[in-house]
């Protein structure tokens, strides 16, 4: 999640005008995000484990509805692949694709992550 956040943070700052757009940096950050999002994370939630086994904000629903989690992960992998394909092609291309990544992140966070206390 930290790798996602680091790379998406750079891309979001560029898209919002909080940082200068840099085509090379945007392309690298989007590729990094896609590589991380494309990793098989299923082993992070093995059967028999729970959110009480580690310090985590993961909700129990990750274990009880794992196929839905996998769908959310695929949505992030797909949207980050689309972003990686265009992030270095200009600020407008970045802006046009980053929203789908944000929606993918939000969908998983809304369903599977506890709010900060």
Predicted region positions:
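Sequence context surrounding c-type heme c attachment/ligation sites in exported
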Residues: 1-23, 27-117
């Amino acid at each position: 999640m930290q790798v996602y956040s680091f790379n998406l943070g750079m891309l979001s700052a560029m898209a919002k005008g909080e940082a200068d757009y840099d085509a090379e940096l945007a392309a690298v950050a989007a590729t990094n995000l896609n590589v991380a999002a494309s990793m098989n994370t299923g082993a992070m939630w093995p059967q028999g484990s729970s959110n009480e086994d580690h310090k985590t904000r993961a909700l129990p629903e990750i274990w009880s509805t794992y196929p839905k989690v996998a769908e959310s992960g695929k949505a992030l992998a797909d949207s980050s692949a689309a972003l990686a394909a265009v992030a270095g092609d200009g600020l407008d291309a970045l802006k046009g694709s980053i929203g789908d990544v944000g929606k993918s992140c939000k969908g998983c966070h809304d369903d599977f992550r506890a709010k900060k206390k």
